[in-house]
Amino acid sequence: RDWYIWSDTDPGNGWHQGAQGYYYGFFWSGMPDLNYTNPEVTAQMNNVVRYWLDDIGVDGFRIDAAKHLIEDGDQRENTPATHDWYKKFYAVYKTDHPNAYTVGEVYGAGGFIAQTYTDQLDHVFNFELASGFVNSANGRSNTGINSAYTLTLKNMLEGNFATFLTNHDQNRTMSVFNGD
């Protein structure tokens, strides 16, 4: 039970009725959030990471919805506890695998938000830049890509762009590009 987040009463959005009270599942009822404040959960996640790196031989990880790891009351994203957890996580796998690579999906992240993760993840996807690329390719204003690129150059470490066009939570590029 302590591996998940529970409440005896219904705190509201994101909480779902279970057999033993209400459990927290930010995205939907079929995906309850793990309780990353529980040291057992953290230890098991570290074991999982080591398994994939040591036994399977992967080169790194893509972390979905990275900003939604640990909630603090009504604050559901980018909490200090989330950043603290990632700092420790980063140290765990980088110690034995310094070349392992992690990229985080931090929806809405541009250059400024990405700065807050530089000591926690190798990169975060730059959503502002992606939106600018798509809008410019569709013949819309180039000001979006210009400002996103300028902010990226100003706020990101050199070469830390983590560019993409769209992802699994968005319409795919073939359906968003006009014409070609």
Which residues fall in each region the model found?
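Active-site and adjacent substrate-binding regions of carbohydrate-active enzymes
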Residues: 1-180
